């Protein structure tokens, strides 16, 4: 299957959206970058549903919203990652998103399946950074 890559686009306020398709797993992870104030309306728009709002968004360096039946998880970052710490936060949130994907696949994380997780983190991080640099 061909990789589908979307350039960052502005959606729902001041957020930039990046779609990362996970290849043969036919699973999409969304990353949005921008102010926390626009996040609730984005999630409700993307998933066409209400969700349990989190009050800790304003202090967070990044978050991963999971558990949606109709779409993949959403990684949120307050700004484009540039420092090692910010890129590390993206990788951290990517791990949460990939655990969701592996649950969806029915695959337990263990030594003989950890390559899916490790490769996936690299794929998400490199895709998000590449798409943000295109701006």
Language-model features, listed with the residues they occupy:
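Short, solvent-exposed segments of well-ordered alpha helices
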Residues: 81, 85, 109-112
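Short, charged/polar N-terminal "headpieces" of proteins
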Residues: 1-54
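Post-HExxH zinc-binding segment in Zn-dependent metallohydrolases
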Residues: 108-135
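Catalytic Zn2+-binding segment of zinc metalloproteases
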Residues: 94-111
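Short C-terminal domain-edge/linker segments immediately following a structured domain
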Residues: 60-65, 105-109, 119
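Short alpha-helical catalytic segment bearing the HExxH-like zincin motif
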Residues: 85-94
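Active-site scaffold of zinc-dependent metalloenzymes
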Residues: 36, 40-84, 97-101
């Amino acid at each position: 299957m061909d990789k589908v890559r979307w350039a960052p686009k502005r959606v729902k306020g001041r957020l930039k959206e990046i779609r990362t398709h996970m290849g043969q797993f036919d699973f999409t992870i969304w990353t949005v970058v921008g102010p926390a104030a626009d996040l609730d309306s984005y999630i409700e728009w993307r998933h066409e549903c209400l969700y349990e709002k989190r009050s800790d968004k304003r202090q967070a360096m990044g978050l991963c919203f999971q558990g949606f039946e109709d779409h993949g998880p959403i990684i949120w970052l307050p700004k484009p990652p540039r420092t090692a710490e910010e890129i590390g936060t993206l990788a951290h949130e990517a791990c949460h998103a990939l655990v969701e994907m592996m649950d969806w696949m029915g695959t337990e994380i263990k030594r003989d399946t950890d390559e899916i997780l490790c490769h996936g983190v690299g794929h998400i991080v490199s895709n998000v950074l590449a798409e943000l640099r295109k701006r």
